Amino acid sequence: MLTEQQRRELDWEKTDGLMPVIVQHAVSGEVLMLGYMNPEALDKTIESGKVTFFSRTKQRLWTKGETSGNFLNVVNIAPDCDNDTLLVLANPIGPTCHKGTSSCFGDTAHQWLFLYQLEQLLAERKSADPETSYTAKLYASGTKRIAQKVGEEGVETALAATVHDRFELTNEASDLMYHLLVLLQDQDLDLTTVIENLRKRHQ
């Protein structure tokens, strides 16, 4: 998040009091939208944790999602090298664009975004009816059963690779990834935590 020194160094005069703000998906890196903030909008964004702009058409502060419920939850805010533009990393609740797409720039989503969306769906399935949802049934069966499924799918993935069956390997790898995500959710872990750990190992 912005430090006090970074906030003091922002060049509001250069931008006539309205600073362009690029909002980027904190997980996938997809550019979600462009908006403008004045100092008050920035203050409210930091205080509320939800992206708030100054609307040039409404001439007032406008929290993204205040009508639709599709909020942008702030993860981090950073200035550019000239202190006249802000980059906001956020996790969106629902589609960002009023047209129903994830980005106001059209279908620019990276394939990794689907994993994030799947992860959110799997988290929601924790409270679903086990009678109507396979995922909910897995959660209800307990950690040992979920772990067993991960092991089974891992073996099947390896076997498909040993016989060079690319079709089956793709299917089994998909099953393995799905069950691994369920296991992570069962343990209150997410894919971002795993990715960060991989990054640390790579350094």
From Swiss-Prot:
CDD domains attached to this UniProt entry:
NTP-PPase_HisIE_like (cd11534)
Family, similarity comment: In the N-terminal section; belongs to the PRA-CH family. In the C-terminal section; belongs to the PRA-PH family.
GO MF terms held by the record = ATP binding; phosphoribosyl-AMP cyclohydrolase activity; phosphoribosyl-ATP diphosphatase activity
User: Segment Phosphoribosyl-AMP cyclohydrolase: which positions?
Assistant: 1-114
What biological-process GO terms show up in the record? L-histidine biosynthetic process
- Name of the protein described by the UniProt record: Histidine biosynthesis bifunctional protein HisIE
What subcellular locations does the record give? Cytoplasm
Which pathway is this protein engaged in?
Answer: Amino-acid biosynthesis; L-histidine biosynthesis; L-histidine from 5-phospho-alpha-D-ribose 1-diphosphate: step 2/9; Amino-acid biosynthesis; L-histidine biosynthesis; L-histidine from 5-phospho-alpha-D-ribose 1-diphosphate: step 3/9
Q: What domain of life does the native source organism fall in?
A: Bacteria
Which InterPro entries does its entry note? His_synth_HisIE (IPR023019), HisE (IPR008179), PRib-ATP_PPHydrolase-like (IPR021130), PRib_AMP_CycHydrolase_dom (IPR002496), PRib_AMP_CycHydrolase_sf (IPR038019)
Q: Name one GO cellular component term.
A: cytoplasm
Q: Which UniProt keywords apply?
A: Amino-acid biosynthesis, ATP-binding, Cytoplasm, Histidine biosynthesis, Hydrolase, Multifunctional enzyme, Nucleotide-binding
What's the encoding gene here? hisI
Reactions listed under catalytic activity: 1-(5-phospho-beta-D-ribosyl)-ATP + H2O = 1-(5-phospho-beta-D-ribosyl)-5'-AMP + diphosphate + H(+); 1-(5-phospho-beta-D-ribosyl)-5'-AMP + H2O = 1-(5-phospho-beta-D-ribosyl)-5-[(5-phospho-beta-D-ribosylamino)methylideneamino]imidazole-4-carboxamide
Q: What Enzyme Commission number(s) apply to this enzyme?
A: 3.5.4.19, 3.6.1.31
Instruction: Spell out the SUPFAM superfamilies in the cross-references.
Output: all-alpha NTP pyrophosphatases, HisI-like
